[in-house]
Amino acid sequence: MTQTATAPISPESRAERPRSHWDRVATAAEHQHWDAVASGVAEILAADVLERDRGNLDPTTELEPLRSSGLVNLLDPAEFGGGGAVWSTAFRVIRILAAADASLAQILLYHYVNSANIAFSAPESERERFYRATIEGRWLWGDSVNPVDPDLELTPRGDGFELNGLKRFSTGVSSGDAVLVNAVIATGDRAGETLTFVLPRDRAGIEPLGDWDFLGQRQSASGSVRFTGVRVDASEILGALVDEPFATLITPSIQLGFGNLYLGIAQGALAKGRGLTLGRKNSWFLSGVETYAQDPFVRRLYGELVAHTAAAEALADRVGALHDAEVARGAAVTAESRAAQAIEIAKVKIVTDALALDVTTRIYEATGSSSAKSAIGLDLYWRNVRTHSLHDPVDYKKLEVGANYLTGDVQPLSLYT
C-alpha cells in the first residue's frame, strides 16, 4: 500500500477527535477491497504451507506478503498512511488467511490486537508517534502478555524501568519487529500497577527460546521469551491497565478474532475436502453411483457441514458489525454495553470452536482413506484448530452465555473475558 507523508495533528484538532479512529462501521467496498487483498496473500501462503508446517521453524520471509500487501497496517489510521479499516474487515482478513495458513493468520491477528493498544491504552497526545513508527516501519507486533503466566518483574530504574523474567506463549516475538509487554511494577510508589509498553525486538536482553514444538499452529512463533536486564524507556510506555469500558474492548476483540480464525480453518478444510472428493474417480461398490461426489451419504455430509459453516459465518458477520458499532461509540461505551458485546462474541467462540473441530474431523468421512496420506496434509486443519482452541476453555464461554441468559450475570473483567 502506498504511504504518503502527512502533517502532524495540531493539539486543537486532536482535542476534537473521537476516542479512536475506529469511529464508523465498515462499508461493503472496504470489505471487498481487503477481501481481495487477503485472498491474494492466502494464495501465496497456501503454496508451501505443508512444507513450512513440517519444517517447524519460526516464519521469516513468508511474513513479507503481510507487509507488502498492506495487511499489517490495515487497522492503522489512514491519516498517517495506514489502511484506515475497521475491526470487522480485519476479522474477515483473518478468516480468509486462516483457510490457507492458520499459523500466519494467528500472527497477524495478534499483531492487530497488540498494535491496537496504541488506541486502547495510549494517551491521545502520544498515539501519533507510535502510529507513524509502526506504519513507516511496517512493524509486526508480537507480545509477551500471557496473563496466566505472571513471571515478569518490572523494576524502576531512573526515568524508566528494567524488565526481567520469562514469559511463555509469546506469539510473534521471535519473528516480529516490536514486542508488546504487560508487566507489574515490583517496587516503589507505583508497586502493583500493571504497565503496557512496546519494545523493539532487537533490544538487548530479549531472548526468544525457540521452544514452540506443538501439535498444530507450528509456525505461529509462540514460544517462550526470556527478558534479562531489558531497558524500558518512559517513551515506550503506552499506559497502565485500566477498567475504562472502551479500553477493555481489547479482550473481546481478540476473542472475536479467535472465532474467525476457527471459522476460516473450517472453511479451508471444506474447500480442501471438496477438491479431494471431486478428484475421486471411483465409488463405494454399494452406492449404485459412479463417483463419490454422487454418493448420497457423501452429499448428505457435505450438506450438513456446509450449512453449519454458513450459519457460523452469518453469526460471525453479524457480531463483527456489532463490534464495529460498539468500538465506534468510543468514550460512550459503558460497562453494560461492553458486557453485552462480550456475550455476543462468546456465542461466536462457542459455535466456531465446535464447528471447526467437527468439520476438520468429519471431512475424512467424505474424502476417504486415501486422504489420510501424510503428503495430502488434510490433518493440518484439525491439528491447528485443536491446538489453538485450547487457548482458553470454551466451557467458560458457555458458562458466560448461560449465566447471562438465565440471570443476567456477566463475568468480571479479565484478559480472557
Predicted regions and their residues:
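Charge-rich, acidic-biased intrinsically disordered regions
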Residues: 63-65, 288-294, 325-344, 369-387, ...
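Glycine-rich beta->alpha junctions and the first turn(s) of the following alpha-helix
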Residues: 214-310
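Amphipathic, small/basic residue-rich leader segments at the start of a protein or domain
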Residues: 1-109
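A short core secondary-structure module
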Residues: 169-208
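Generic structural signal for well-ordered, non-transmembrane alpha-helical segments
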Residues: 39, 264-267, 271, 303-310, ...
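Glycine-rich phosphate/cofactor-binding loops in nucleotide/flavin-utilizing enzymes
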Residues: 365-417
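Glycine-rich flavin
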Residues: 60-68, 73-175
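C-terminal helix-coil-helix/basic helical segment that borders enzyme active sites and/or dimer interfaces
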Residues: 46, 50-53, 310-347, 364-369
